[in-house]
């Protein structure tokens, strides 16, 4: 299947499940977010990108601390749900876009989150390279990798290949179906 066909299928799937997404996946997503945030602080001047933001579950954890939170997703249905959550915050903005081709300048964000994104992308290396491009110097990148899709060695190798400083990859939590990698762009 070509790259765009895979992305289109993913987009259509999430458009269909958007209204029930939180009911189906919120507990699992929140466990990933909470694991990541135990490792990374969010200073008041933070500029955060939540790439593949889904329904915006991350917003409730970071928006009250950050200067700006940008939620990006390819699914209009998920963004409609995220919009409801974003209304509670004056600093959350949403963008309908492909995570491989974000509309942001180089080096903008202090924190880039990619929770449950890579397993949905046809070329995870390309996606990560784009996330690194928009991350500022010394920015944190928090990336999850579904264990059914990626081995720990593959994920760590990919992060290191792209010259990220891997601080930690959380693997041992039985509640998580994924690895949670905390990295810094150097």
Residue locations for each model-derived region?
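A short acidic, Gly/Pro-enriched loop at the edge of an enzyme's catalytic core
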Residues: 100-112
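Conserved class I S-adenosyl-L-methionine
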Residues: 1-42, 57, 149, 177-180
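Core SAM-dependent methyltransferase catalytic element
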Residues: 171-186
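Conserved beta-strand signature within the Rossmann-like core of class I S-adenosyl-L-methionine
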Residues: 138-146
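Short alpha-helix
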Residues: 149-162, 179
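A short glycine-rich, Lys/Arg-flanked "PGG" loop and its adjoining helix->strand segment in the class I
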Residues: 125-137
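Class I SAM-dependent methyltransferase SAM/SAH-binding core
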Residues: 49, 55-101
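A short SAM/SAH-binding and catalytic strip from SAM-dependent methyltransferases
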Residues: 111-123
